[in-house]
């Protein structure tokens, strides 16, 4: 297995050498927002960075520092929330891509832990294709529905994951010291008729900030799902890089 090549701990010479070996960089994207009373504000950052670190180890890609803020409008009035506007996050992604492309990065991988960041990833990737001809691939827990159906016991709240069995199980694998299971509660708030068709805020629906049942979370479930995510994302990274090289050769 490869040693993880983390930007924050590397010198300029080490980065130059690493880019020469495998010109792929991973940018984790997260958010700073409430996750109930049993999980910390940084869940989305921590999970994205944890998954990204394992993928970097598996593939040899360089690991960029995580973006700690995302689009968190729905929790804007709850203490601890820090939210970026979507176009600001898109601009951050693009600026990072322009920066790393200048010294040889050929493929940027976005690993996201916060679903509301997905639009920003998509539009940044499209614009970067036009501006730099740089391939950008992006992930938000690929195969999530199938893996949850296989490994989780509780239902989601209308397909949403937030402070639920899924996220709590992953936290129990990667950061168990930051999980307070004794404070975990299940909550499935009533869904307003105009939810998804108006500016109804999630922050107004759940008393606990939980959507689902984190009390059913276990380390074993988290391990099985995490291993699957690492396998899927790592395979896609290698495939995307091979395609990039074939395109360069005109194959």
Segments from the language model and where they lie:
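Extended, histidine- and acidic-residue-enriched regions that form the cofactor-binding/catalytic faces
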Residues: 1-109, 113-251
């Amino acid at each position: 297995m490869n040693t993880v090549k983390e930007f924050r701990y590397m010198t300029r010479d080490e980065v130059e050498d690493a880019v020469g070996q495998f010109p792929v960089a991973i940018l984790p994207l997260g958010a700073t927002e409430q996750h109930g009373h049993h999980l910390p504000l940084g869940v989305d950052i921590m999970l994205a960075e944890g998954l990204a670190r394992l993928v970097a180890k598996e593939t040899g890609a360089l690991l960029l520092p995580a973006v700690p803020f995302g689009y968190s409008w729905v929790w804007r009035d709850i203490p601890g929330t820090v939210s970026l506007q979507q176009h600001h996050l898109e601009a951050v992604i693009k600026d990072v891509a322009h920066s790393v492309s200048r010294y040889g990065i050929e493929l940027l991988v976005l690993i996201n832990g916060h679903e509301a960041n997905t639009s920003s990833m998509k539009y940044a990737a499209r614009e970067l294709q036009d501006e730099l001809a740089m391939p950008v691939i992006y992930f938000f827990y690929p195969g999530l529905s199938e893996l949850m159906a296989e490994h989780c016991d509780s239902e989601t709240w209308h397909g949403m994951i937030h402070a639920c069995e899924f996220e709590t199980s992953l936290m129990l694998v990667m950061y168990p010291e930051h999980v307070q299971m004794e404070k975990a509660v299940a909550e499935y708030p009533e869904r307003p008729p105009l939810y998804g068709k108006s500016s109804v805020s999630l922050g107004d629906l759940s008393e606990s900030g939980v959507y689902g049942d984190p009390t059913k979370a276990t380390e074993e479930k988290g391990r099985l799902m995490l291993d699957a995510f690492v396998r899927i994302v790592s395979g896609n990274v290698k495939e995307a890089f091979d395609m990039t090289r074939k395109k360069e050769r005109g194959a």
